Each structure stands twice: as structure tokens, then as C-alpha cells.
Amino acid sequence: MGGMIGYSHKTHANAFTIELKGESLFHASITGQSVIGGIFGSLDDTQIQFTPASRLYMDNESLEASSGICGTLAGALSYQEPGKEILLDPEILVINPNIKIKGGNNVGGIIGKLYNGTLTGTYTPEFSTTNVIVSKIPRPIFPGNINSEKPYRENAASIGGIVGYADKSTLRRLFTQPSIYGRSTVGGIIGYASDTQISDCGVKTETFNNGNNSAIMVGGIIGQASCSSHLSFPI
């Protein structure tokens, strides 16, 4: 279920492409059982492109998947072949800082569940001579709330500021500022990362997991990471 498209998949040899142009405002709150996205519900082999002149204002008050898989841009996004890139510019994809995303598992600020995809932002960290980040705080690609208000989702897992669950994917140059809560595998960028690369990403948050003393696998960047061959985090 999505604000614009519920489900899309390719029907021919070439992947389907959605090109977003002009200005659009998404305001509706969306509630369902699973695979909920502010714009797209579930996309298979569907390329998303933003034109430089486009503006997407995500003014949704809330997005909720009672069982799980939820994100502001898409609930689930997957590709058969690697290398498909989505460019995320916070000046183009403008998300309401008061948005409330709720779900049980695989919940992310941008995408709930990502497979074989690449997300690239505009953030460039700057370092001092002593390798301390001195960059000014930029506009975050996701500034909202994920399961961060009562009643909490006590069993929520794979919760991330950008992606809830990422497999065989790449995230780079993304900055997020979420208020985030989960019971396990909670990360500022990715909740659960499997065979996934992360580089040049940053997180700033004042509310992280709401002091849940029983929470496990909680990380500023990644909640839990696993790999079958190699895992790269050149952060």
C-alpha cells in the first residue's frame, strides 16, 4: 500500500522506471497490515528517478504497518540485478520532521526492506587533521520519528533511520536525524545489514531507543551486521 503506487514490477526484459517531475505533496496518513510506503508500497525491479526540478513534500502525519515493512519512500524495494541507484537529495525529497512511522519489523525512515539496491545521498563529511568530523549539520534525508512515541512496539526489530533491513545493498552519503525505538537490531542508518556496504553516512539523534534497558543489538550506525563473504563499512 502506497500513497501513489501500491505495487509495481517489470513485465518485460527491462526494468520499469518511474520518473518524478514537478512538485508533489503527499499528505495522507496511511495505515495497513504490512508493506506500507508514503509513496510506494512494494517495488520489484522498478527504477526511481528524481529530476533536478522535482520536489516531493512528504507531509504525512503518520505511516503505520501493524505487522511490519514500512518506510517514507517505499515499504519494500528489490532488484534482481545489483547496481540500480536511487539518488536521495533532502532538497528534493522533503520529509515532515513530525512524521510518525510505526511498525513491527523492517521499518526504515526511507525504505523498510531493501534488496540489491543502492541509495546515494548528498552528504559529504569533512574531517579535521585529527580525523574528527567538523562538518556542519546538514538537512537530514530523514528527520522524523520511528516507533518513538507511546505505546511503544515492544517487540519491534530491524528498525533503521534510513533502512530497516538491507540485503546485498549499498548506502552512501546519507545523513539522518531520527528519533528511533526498537526492541532489537536497531541502527541509526540500518537496523539489520546483510552483505551490505555503507560509506560516508552520518547520524544525529537525541532520542535513541528511549532508554530501553532490555534492548539488544542497538548501534549508532547498524544494529546487526552479517555477511557471507565480505562486509564493507568505509565510514
Which sequence ranges carry the predicted segments?
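Predominantly extracellular/luminal carbohydrate-interaction, adhesion, and secreted-enzyme modules
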Residues: 1-235
